[in-house]
């Protein structure tokens, strides 16, 4: 039996790893649209941009992993169609590959600007190694950097840029940074720290157009009429799941490929995991699409156990982390529908602990610069009754 994996990110590669761990002996083939071996994505918005680490320092798996585990990986080979009747995928170069089981692990794509000037040189996105190398080059050449979007990735890029001595402005459409992922207490502490480092924030601000000169960006124009100087604009306004293959294969989609608890789609031979999958998360208590390393690894283990017929691993709370100018931010659990927050903050040491409760049950935690405490709290978050 041949298993084909479309996508060579954390989800896809770890699915192949767990298939071997669970004893699968058949052929495994991973297809990647990129020309480089699978790599870790988190460093791309941090140390990689400041040249503290090189491309060779971020492999997803050690050298020899694919050969030692008899996993075939085809680089620079995008899959463009699925024939569900014949159980065949076709690559861009016209070749066909048969599968018994197909795992869709396609990464999300950056949401792109559509305003006037969005196609000018100097407007950059960050999702891939190629994007990161391009952005790293442009950071060297730029003095004024505007980051559109105050989410985790945007703030990581802003932190890297200010660390390189650039003048940095973050434009965020909502009243606070990281509004979708952290509490106001964490957001305010992070913003205060980054402002102290020299980053300027424009909150409740909407970009209306980009002005340029000789084909290159020069200014961002806000709805208020304010104009902000920019040699480089980094866009971090969210990501969109890649659903073209699933849609053409007539799979059920809804802001992601809809899957059951075993990561199986509406076609029993096709699975979806990671960024592209809309799956029920027991801690969120609903169908949700999450773009985190923890989610990708969890999905990979579940799909492998399902295919191999082994017991499904026990669920663990969702988690994320970031590193922002000396602030180790960690989140655990599903931060929604809480009825009580317990906040402990030390502005001098930049330490924060937030405990979120629902009906006296701990459902989520946030910490800044308290890694041991976060680890101790992990076991306290239980599945809803």
Curated annotation (Swiss-Prot):
Transmembrane segments: none annotated. GO terms for molecular function: flavin adenine dinucleotide binding; oxidoreductase activity, acting on NAD(P)H; rubredoxin-NAD+ reductase activity; rubredoxin-NADP+ reductase activity. It catalyses: 2 reduced [rubredoxin] + NAD(+) + H(+) = 2 oxidized [rubredoxin] + NADH. One of its GO terms (cellular component) is cytoplasm. Its main location: cytoplasm. Induction: Induced by AlkS. It holds the Pfam family Reductase_C. It comes from the Bacteria. GO terms for biological process: alkane catabolic process. FAD binds at residues 8-11, 32-33, 79, 156, 275, 293. It is found in: Cytoplasm. Keywords: Cytoplasm, FAD, Flavoprotein, NAD, Oxidoreductase, Plasmid. Its EC number is 1.18.1.1. It is an enzyme of class 1 (oxidoreductase). Its cofactor is FAD. InterPro entries: FAD-oxidoreductase/Apoptosis, FAD/NAD-bd_sf, FAD/NAD-binding_dom, FAD/NAD-linked_Rdtase_dimer_sf, Reductase_C. Pathway: Hydrocarbon metabolism; alkane degradation. Homodimer. Belongs to the FAD-dependent oxidoreductase family. Involved in the hydrocarbon hydroxylating system, which transfers electrons from NADH to rubredoxin reductase and then through rubredoxin to alkane 1 monooxygenase. This is Rubredoxin-NAD(+) reductase. The lineage of its organism: Bacteria, Pseudomonadati, Pseudomonadota, Gammaproteobacteria, Pseudomonadales. The gene is alkT.
């Amino acid at each position: 039996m041949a298993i084909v994996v479309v996508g060579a990110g954390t989800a896809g590669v770890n699915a192949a790893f767990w298939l071997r761990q669970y004893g699968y002996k058949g052929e495994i083939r991973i297809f990647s649209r990129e020309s480089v071996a699978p790599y870790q994505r988190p460093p791309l918005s941090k140390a990689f941009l400041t040249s503290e680490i090189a491309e060779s320092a971020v492999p997803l798996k050690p050298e020899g992993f694919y050969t030692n585990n008899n996993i075939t990986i085809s680089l620079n080979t995008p899959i463009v169609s699925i024939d569900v009747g014949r159980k065949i995928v076709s690559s861009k170069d016209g070749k066909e590959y048969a599968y018994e089981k197909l795992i869709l692990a396609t990464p999300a794509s950056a949401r792109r600007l559509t305003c006037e000037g969005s196609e000018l040189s100097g407007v950059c996105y960050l999702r891939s190694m190629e994007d990161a190398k391009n952005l790293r080059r442009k950071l060297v050449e730029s003095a004024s950097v505007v980051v559109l979007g105050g989410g985790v990735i945007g703030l990581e890029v802003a932190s890297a840029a200010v660390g390189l001595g650039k003048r940095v402005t973050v434009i965020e459409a909502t009243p606070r940074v990281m509004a979708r992922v952290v509490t106001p207490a964490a957001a305010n502490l992070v913003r205060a720290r980054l402002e102290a480092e020299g980053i300027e924030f424009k909150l409740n601000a909407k970009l209306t157009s980009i002005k340029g000169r000789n084909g290159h960006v020069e200014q961002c124009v806000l709805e208020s009429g304010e104009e902000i100087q920019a040699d480089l604009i980094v866009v971090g306004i969210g990501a969109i799941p890649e659903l073209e293959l699933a849609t053409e294969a007539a799979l059920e989609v809804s802001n992601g490929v809809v899957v059951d608890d075993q990561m199986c789609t509406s076609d029993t031979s096709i699975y979806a995991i990671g960024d592209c999958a809309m799956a029920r998360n027991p801690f969120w208590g609903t169908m949700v699409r999450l773009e985190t390393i923890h989610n990708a690894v969890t999905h990979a283990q579940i799909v492998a156990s399902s295919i191999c017929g082994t017991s499904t691993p026990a669920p663990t709370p969702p988690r994320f982390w970031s590193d922002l100018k000396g602030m180790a931010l960690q989140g655990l659990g599903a931060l929604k529908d809480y009825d009580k927050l317990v906040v402990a903050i030390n502005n001098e040491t930049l330490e924060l602990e937030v405990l979120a409760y629902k009906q006296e049950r701990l459902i989520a935690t946030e910490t800044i610069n308290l890694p041991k405490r976060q680890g101790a709290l992990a076991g306290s978050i239980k599945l809803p009754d």
